[in-house]
Amino acid sequence: MTIRKIIVLTLIFGLTLHAVFLNPSFSEENPRSDISVNSLSSKFPNDWVTTGTSLMYGISDDAGFMVSEDGGARWETRNVGLPVKWIYPYNDAEPRTLTALAVDPCRPERVAVTTARQLFISEDSGRTWREIVFSKPFPAAAFVTAVALSPQEPKAIAVGTAYQGLYETRDFGKTWVNLTPHLQFLYQGAGFYEEISALAYHPQDGKRLIFGCGFGKGLYQLHRESGAVKLSGFDPESTSHITGVYFSRIAGDGKKPEFWQLSLRTRSHTAHYQWDPIQKIGETKHIEPILDDEAVQRRLQASNRFGLYLRPDYASGRRLDEKLSFMKENGLNTIVVDFKDDSGYITYNTSLSFPKQIGAVRSQINIREFLKKAKEHRIYVIGRLVVFKDERLYRYQNCKYAIWDHKTGKPWGHFVKTTDVSGNTVWVQREFWVDPYHADVWDYNISLAQELESLGVDEIQFDYIRFPTDGDLSTATYRYRRKGMEKVDALESFLRKARAALRVPISTDLYGFNCWFNMDSWNGQNMAIFSKYVDVICPMYYPSHFPSAFMKESGYLERARQIYRQGTYRAEQIGRSRSLIRPYVQAFLLGGERKMDKATYSDYLKRQIQGAVEGDASGFLLWNFSNQYYMVTKSLAEFLQKLQGQQDVRSEE
């Protein structure tokens, strides 16, 4: 398997482009204020729509909403009235990431944009904005991925989501209607629907919606009364991963009458079709320049790494020798080892003073000897650092850095009920979390990463880079949260600072669902944003951790393969190929899985690996906290070689 080119989707026209930027001021007291964008790096939109005239609209990851009135020769930002984010280094507010864009094809001055959880409409090409408020039955936790404006009903707006279906208002948000019952064919189980990735009203019939499904699931037409049908007549590549559906009116030229054009946008191109009858009339290719040389080199270094997790007490002596032999037998070339564990202990002989000051050093690894031996065996070493779950830092200076419990006025924790030796019921704290908003917490972890880099560790892996998800979260409060910051902003700030401080590849571990769907509200993990800073995303697609009702149509073993196959592909799409995808493989049994016999659990493991390879993962990592990799019953080397050969043939086809 060869490393795929890592690309940033940037609009490049066949002429020189220039950007015009506004320069208003920002007030931290008003997080939806005028913002300065002079310092932003992106000058062109990464998603855009034409209107049939020289007027164009776009959205940029960095610059927000953009407008061109001359066909793309010049762009300016119009973000006054749109939300901003306040993240490190806090020099200026930055536009909050926009997730969708729509234009009224009959009145092109009407335009709408969304963030993950908000909707805004402008009647004057973005000069002023008005928020359209979501209310029940629109789900509070929905992640918005698509929006459409009706040309027939000015107050009608449709909104698509990442996993909770499709909704419509016909009165500017006073009431909402759930259209999802029409879309049962998109149901994936356990309350999750396939993503609505693109959306447009039919230009002549306000009862009809055209929508695209994410991840290659096609293009559909929904009628409010008669339901949904899949549309045909389009090239397969036009509907492979639709990110935009737009109508525009094309004027006649004397030889050909006026007609409606439907544009289908994907990451690689925009295909243009005459609408009804459907006929392809052209396409626009999107030029995809590669990342800068340093980023490309980091990804080359991190690509195609097949390995396992090594506990610190297995990182020396006979145990290490046994694991190195096991790796050689199975064609593995990578070790992930805890250098800061789940309790906050530093497991190597650090020279930093602060870990010693907080009582965090429990040296189990002579790091120089360990790295020397690993290099002798040509092993790529990934240093795992558990970031925000950290009992040692939590307890420091009377819990200075702890998440706080606003109800008790004490440090917040995740407590579980248990029985003590006397048979009494007691509550025991299971998890200790520090505040992800505190810059001292970021700096502490980054200093460890820098030390590991200087010692020769090949890659830094940040784990538990999220907010807590268990316990009574309703009482958790974050004392160091700046006004206007959201959970995702704290994590982005940390990653931005870490990226600037480190030269080696950075990887992050993410929940499986956070790589399967666009989401971020519950634990702050937004994979699309993470991929701007890290070289590798490691989804934890453990089949046992997915709800049993999710993808239940497949048998349990085939379900495991599909979770990794589809999940790897979906993660690559969500991250826009900016990060390599290297999933963790479940090399342990949980719950009812423990009843599996040897042949079954061996097959279970191989199905996961097979799915990852078929999804074009850049390697994988076996995870078993006990370090007893009993599910590997036969050498993986030949199995991997065969799988990769099959995948290379598919790629050539």
Question: Locations of the language-model features?
Answer:
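Substrate-binding cleft of secreted/luminal carbohydrate-active enzymes
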Residues: 535-548, 557-564, 570, 579-647
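Aromatic-lined carbohydrate-recognition surfaces of secreted/lumenal glycan-active proteins
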Residues: 382-386, 461-462, 487-523, 578-588
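Aromatic- and acidic-residue-enriched segments that line the glycan-binding/catalytic groove
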Residues: 347-358, 390-424, 468-483, 597
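Active-site-adjacent "subsite" loops/lids of carbohydrate-active enzymes
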Residues: 298-315, 388-451, 606
